[in-house]
């Protein structure tokens, strides 16, 4: 099921970067999965527990991409300003990001939270700033519908805020791709168990 929403080429690129670090992070998989699951509790009532995955899984993927790209964000934006008029610009932006994916939006989770009145519009603009390969991954979630639902019920800001906490950091310098895979498996298991409980 994990392959359904994460393209292998994106993970391979992150994995190559991790090998250069020459260290295992040794994070507590269960602890990180529990933290993410606790965020899901905030949408109780709006979603049934077995539906939490419709929000939590795409948000986890988005946060992973966000934290991975954050260190090279300024460089990508600088390069984008120079090449935005070109028809083919992916190679320049990929080199600037250091990955086979990038984001050209001016937003980060911090700046999204700084403008709560426009959080839905700005979050959609942030997602549209991702390279096409990431947008293809995100399309599998049909997440735009959930963003509207969260925004209409005053939950979108809170979800982004919780995913932006220091404990929810998911950059490859702290969480390897292998660990991330285990976290997803743990989350999927929790969603399945909650479905059985209903």
Task: Tell where the protein language model's regions lie, with residue ranges.
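Non-catalytic, mostly N-terminal accessory regions of nucleic-acid modification and defense proteins
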Residues: 2-198
């Amino acid at each position: 099921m994990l392959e359904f929403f994460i393209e292998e080429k994106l993970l391979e690129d992150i994995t190559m970067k991790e090998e250069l670090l020459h260290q295992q992070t040794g994070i507590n998989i269960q602890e990180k999965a529990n933290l993410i699951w606790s965020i899901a509790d905030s949408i109780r009532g709006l979603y049934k527990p077995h539906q939490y995955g419709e929000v939590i899984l795409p948000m986890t993927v988005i946060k992973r991409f966000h934290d991975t790209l954050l260190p090279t964000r300024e460089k990508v934006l600088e390069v984008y300003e120079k090449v935005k008029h070109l028809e083919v610009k992916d190679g320049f932006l990929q080199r600037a990001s250091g990955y086979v994916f990038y984001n050209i939006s001016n937003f980060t989770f911090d700046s999204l939270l700084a403008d709560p009145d426009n959080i839905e519009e700005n979050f959609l603009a942030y997602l549209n700033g991702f390279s096409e390969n990431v947008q293809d991954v995100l399309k599998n979630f049909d997440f735009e519908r959930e963003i509207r639902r969260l925004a209409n019920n005053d939950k979108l800001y809170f979800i982004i805020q919780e995913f932006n906490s220091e404990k929810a950091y998911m950059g490859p310098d702290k969480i390897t791709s292998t660990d991330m895979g285990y976290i997803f498996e743990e989350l999927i298991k929790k969603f399945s168990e909650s479905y059985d409980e209903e």
